[in-house]
Regions:
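Phosphate-binding/switch loop-helix module in NTP-utilizing enzymes
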Residues: 17-60
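Conserved Switch II/interswitch segment of TRAFAC-class P-loop GTPases
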Residues: 67-86, 112
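Beta-strand-loop-alpha "switch" segments that mediate conformational coupling across diverse proteins
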Residues: 107, 123-152, 165
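Phosphate-binding loop that captures ATP/GTP phosphates
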Residues: 1-16, 121, 133
């Protein structure tokens, strides 16, 4: 009940545990704290989505181990490619479950951008990863939706990014249903 009380509800369908208003050190919480929060959230909700900081903390391992799937967002630039390869090497060196990572390209090329698609393919091959998901650029629509505190599905229901997120959500829901049936 304490966790749900700390969350901000949206139309009683979505509950969000927002980031603290003050900047706090990443080592303020421990891996066991994170694990307990995830367990409580799993008992309360059908799906738990965690947005992690850009830097790895001691408790990042707990999130990776407790997650069913871990999306690593990247963009089509050299810095993101270097960070992806660093992440891959770090996880493999520590024997962490790298196979849980699903790489998602943010601001992916448009449907007709063949040059962009070939760059994505070359990037994936050179990094030795699969880019499982390509999210289109949401542009101002996403910014405006976030500024108004509204989900993209309500403020911009026909946006291409919203449709891709919906496809992803449906596929994750199917995986969840199949896992529940198997158990």
């Amino acid at each position: 009940d304490a966790l749900v009380g700390a969350m901000v509800p949206f139309e009683e369908k979505l509950h969000v545990l927002t980031a603290p208003s003050d900047i706090i050190p990443l080592d303020l919480i421990t891996s066991s704290d994170v694990h307990r929060i995830i367990e409580v959230a799993r008992r309360q909700f059908d799906y738990v989505v965690i947005e992690t900081p850009k830097t790895l903390a001691q408790w990042s391992e707990a999130i990776l181990n407790d997650s069913h799937v871990y999306f690593a967002l990247l963009e089509l630039d050299m810095r993101c490619a270097q960070n992806a390869i660093r992440l891959k090497r770090a996880l493999q060196a520590e024997d962490l479950p790298f196979e849980k990572l699903r790489f998602a390209l943010n601001r992916g090329p448009r449907f007709t951008d063949l040059n962009g698609k070939s760059r994505v393919k070359r990037m994936a091959e050179s990094l030795g990863i699969a880019i499982d998901l390509q999210l289109p650029d949401g542009g101002r629509q996403v910014t405006q939706s976030a500024d108004h505190g509204q989900p993209l599905a309500i403020s911009q229901p026909k946006a291409p990014l919203r449709r891709e997120i919906q496809k992803l959500a449906l596929s994750l829901h199917e995986i969840g249903q199949n896992s529940a049936v198997a158990a």
